[in-house]
Amino acid sequence: MDAEIFFNPYLHTKRSRRDWRAEPAADNKESFLQIVPRGVLYDGATGLIKTQCELSPRMFFEDREYVLDPVMVWPGLDIAADGEAVPPCDFVFHTFDQVVSLVFAEGRGRARRWRQHISPAGNVIRLFGATALGTPVCVNVFGQKSYFYCENRPGEDLRDVIHDLADASRSPGPLSASPSRRAPLVAVRLRPGDIPHLYRVSFNNWSMARKVGALMVQEGRRAYEIGVDPLARFLIDRKIPSFGWLRVGRFSRRCNGQTSTAVIELDCQVGDVVAGQPLPNWPPYRCLSFDIECMSASGAFPQAEVLDDIVIQISCVCFVVGGSGAHRFTFAEKHLFTIGSCAPVEDVWVYTFPSEYEMLLGFFIFFNRFSPDFLTGYNINGFDIKYLLHRMCRVYQKDAGRFTKLRRGGRFFVNSPDGSGDAFGGRSGVIKVFCAGTVVLDMYPVCSAKTSAPNYKLDTMAERYLGQRKEDLSYKEIPVAFLGGEEGRARVGKYCVQDGARQGPLNVIAYHYEAAASPNLARIPLRRVIFDGQQIRIYTCILEECSARGMVLPSLPSSPPSSGGDGAGLEGGDGGTAGRRKKKRSGSAPDGEDEDDPEGGDEGENGECRENGLEKEGSQGSASGNVGYQGATVLAPECGYHHNPILVFDFASLYPSIIMSNNLCYSTLLVDGSPPVPDEDVLEVVVGEATRYRFVREHVRRSLLAELLVRWLKQRKLVRDAMKACGDEKQRMFMDKQQLALKVTCNAFYGFTGVAAPMLPCLPIAASITKIGRDMLLATSAYMERHCNDVEFLVSEVGVPREAVDRDALRVKIVYGDTDSVFVGFRGIGREVLVKVAGKLAAAVTRDLFRDPVRLEFEKMFVSLMMICKKRYIGKVYGENKLCMKGVDLVRRHACAFVRSIVSEVVDVIFHDEAVSEGAMRLSEMSFEELRRQGVPVGFFPVIRRLCDARDDLFLDRVPVAQLVLSSVLSQDASRYKQKNLPHLAVYRSLVERGEELPGVGDRIEYVLTCPDESKKRAPNYEVAEDPAHVREAKIPIHAEKYFDQIVKAVTNVLLPVFPKDMPRRERFFAYVLPIRTYLPEVFLRMSKEDRECGAYLARESGLGMNSFIVYGEDTCGSRVGEGPGRGEGLGVGGGEGTRPPRKNGHARLVSGCLYGSRPFNKKDRFVTLHIE
């Protein structure tokens, strides 16, 4: 450890080392804080070396020294595609990202042609993209005005009003106010005609326009569309796709004074850009996937705010998305940035740096030189990007914005949920990343939204989508390996690179193609599709339609103006900053689990509120919270097990079809002050007891929303038809993403009108949609029960063969109804017949009850259905072997493997064994009194038997310890927990006492529940938790009773609908029916033949049978004591010596009061006697 193994030129200068806390030297040289892990100088050493360095930052690659400079040629990157010819006019390129900059005319190099648009300051829209060959392009669009509409009071000079509202120290700059003829969206509130005294106010400066508009609304003036930024105006007014091909007619190419890193940079005016051909193909875009590794000086989970919690390695993987395979740049695929010397890593370019700052600087220079169009990774929004930006911008006080595609005015920042306001139309609670000219695609929120999995660790997703498992390296091993020497750093580097290399899910899920299908429909940038919800999409769609119709949208006092979420900023302004709140990541995955209790409470039964046979789905409210309306309808479910055909019908595009068929819209709503309309021209919707909403009919005024929906649904149908005829797999994928974008946007209209804190709220529309949908569901249910119980209707209208109907058994009943679906149970008609005629039945309902385009469709048929409660059911679909589950987790996510397997087996046998299915249905139809008299149906015995077998396996120690392991995350240092009585903390303390290797913060601590002393039978989990390795080594018996209790609770939670509805304490069902078995220590099992015969004699003489005298276990020969061939065939007791309890009507007799589990054994007794009352 004495020999220095890594030469650091900054630590070997002849000058004395300066104190790192000292102020930088007062000369022209720029110094920086150098933080170096001591272990890169001395193998195995811990701690950090800090010094203030005045030399130039540098890196080492393949025994060569490089001085780090933002304009350096990076080794391994050859992407400066040169020589692509630029035509004198009609330049065609593909755009993927747009940024709005506020530019000042004082800047040098401004041609007079462009200066007029930015004097003294003006908007410039940067269109980033690429040519067909992949050459980077940036087009600077000048002349886009920021404007809104407002009503001027008679006798006022609008210009004077605006100057008064503007800051006294700042002029609003050039502005124009011209009369405009526009109608309001809610036009029926006024007399026919345009808004009187309406003016369009235009500014060069977007920030000033936003400020003045907001102040007008605050003063009570009527203003319209004040929150629409210049980029949205450009895309909507010019019909420009935000992700697609564009053509620039006239332009001038910048050869000097470029503001971007693009190879081709053009200047043009707003009228020079037009939409190109709507081709689905992309040019080759550069994508960068990266991952970081950090090291905490305290051993806790690294935090960027802590000076000593440094970044030690960064991996980058470069690849191309889109294109046909031909492009004009080449580059190495895998790169590793590391502090200290590093052994070679196969197929990886390794760059070594003397300190953290130099490594960060090297990474950002590499990022700038590679200039990725897409930045991806796993949980990079919540951790990696935030960490890098905080270290670079806050710790080292360097501007990260200058490494983006904009040389001046670039911004690179993270907007955390606790930030100071989201952009207009943004989603709260979403971490947003802005990087000028680069679209960020974090695959963690994508995978968590599109995948149902026990956890969303990268390893789990990679195994799911790629069939790969990574070489795992725990957090506690990373610092040791990194500080151990070159080979250790290479091992950490290989681990880091493999995380960055797993961009496979991006290609498998193809989310980048899905996201790219939405911008053109909504006229919003791709980044807003990714980070902002549906609100902004619907708003811009309505805005575009209103603009085409000569209408304006109102601005609400509570609506915040756009905060520049699309990149409005100052050229030459300060750079981006990192997010203010750190989102912790547990372990090596961002799933954020907290301490888990494997014995958590059971889910409740049916606690929903019911009213007139309906269950309230919930309520929506206005932003103020004082007005609400009842949410979607849920018909009260027939809870239980249904082993008869259940037809499921649903409405196609329910909410869009309601809007279209009933002509609902802002523009058709009659409000106070509306002109009188004849009753026959009005649709009246009664909501509640006294609230009435009125909308004019289609022949009076056509709904704007309806026309949008009709257009999009027709377009979606054309796309779906084209998919069927398309033979190109890639084109089919493009089309599929396009039709999905149309579907999602159509379905979002309902939420747009009624969601809390909306952009354009209209409670009457949302409440009317809900009420009409509720009436449709009730009408469908009544129609089904009234007509389908009539044989003649089934034969004549639906086409059911007369001989296929069992008149005596025919019974049709609504089992469940939920928003847009109806579950109809049929008896007396075979499954095959029902499947054939279900479509005709749906058509008959549509024809008799609804107007076009409302359409009821047959979705599927359940052969068996276990209805647990609303929105929770399990069913077996006709023609499929896989079970359909909704709202049901068979077991808690953190249950052990053995519990999960038993619950799955029980559910499978109920749905796939015909006899068990019949038994379950019979049991669900029984009353508690019938159950007491007749006992559990014979068909249900396999379930009882499987639970008994599971209990045997636990008590007889036949379950491997690995299947009984539970785990919880150590989310912080063990000493910082306020609650000490947690199982995983108890295991941690045990490891400390035994001097074993301790887990680190973020690791999952595994534990097993062990058998306590006889005096602590009811000991809590933290008293019996133990490390699995120690349990195996010391052969400690497990706590079989606790594990079996978990099984019983989990099975009961799932099978609750099967138990008699009037049974008291249904959750105790298995306590009543499972036979008692007492498991004896081996010393008591060595019984002679005479002992056994004596027990049999006592059983016969008592008249209770051997079932009441249960001594259960295994003797030395492996045979079971107290058990005969009839084991498990009885109810409430285990069979013994071939005897079975008396039966009546094919059922075993139910014996009340039996208990399950173990009990203390009395040494004086040969048998444990169960007295039955």
From Swiss-Prot:
PROSITE patterns: DNA_POLYMERASE_B. Residues 591-606 have a biased composition (Acidic residues). SUPFAM superfamilies: DNA/RNA polymerases, Ribonuclease H-like. Residues 554-625, 1123-1144 are annotated as: Disordered. GO terms for biological process: DNA-templated DNA replication; viral DNA genome replication. It is an enzyme of class 2 (transferase). GO terms for cellular component: host cell nucleus. InterPro entries: DNA-dir_DNA_pol_B, DNA-dir_DNA_pol_B_CS, DNA-dir_DNA_pol_B_exonuc, DNA-dir_DNA_pol_B_multi_dom, DNA/RNA_pol_sf, DNA_pol_B_thumb, DNA_pol_palm_dom_sf, DNA_pol_type-B. Pfam families: DNA_pol_B, DNA_pol_B_exo1. GO terms for molecular function: DNA binding; DNA-directed DNA polymerase activity; nucleotide binding. Residues 564-578, 1123-1138 have a biased composition (Gly residues). Keywords: DNA replication, DNA-binding, DNA-directed DNA polymerase, Host nucleus, Nucleotidyltransferase, Transferase, Viral DNA replication. It is found in: Host nucleus. Residues 607-618 have a biased composition (Basic and acidic residues). It catalyses: DNA(n) + a 2'-deoxyribonucleoside 5'-triphosphate = DNA(n+1) + diphosphate. It comes from the Viruses. Its EC number is 2.7.7.7. Belongs to the DNA polymerase type-B family. This is DNA polymerase catalytic subunit. It comes from Rat cytomegalovirus (strain Maastricht). The lineage of its organism: Viruses, Duplodnaviria, Heunggongvirae, Peploviricota, Herviviricetes.
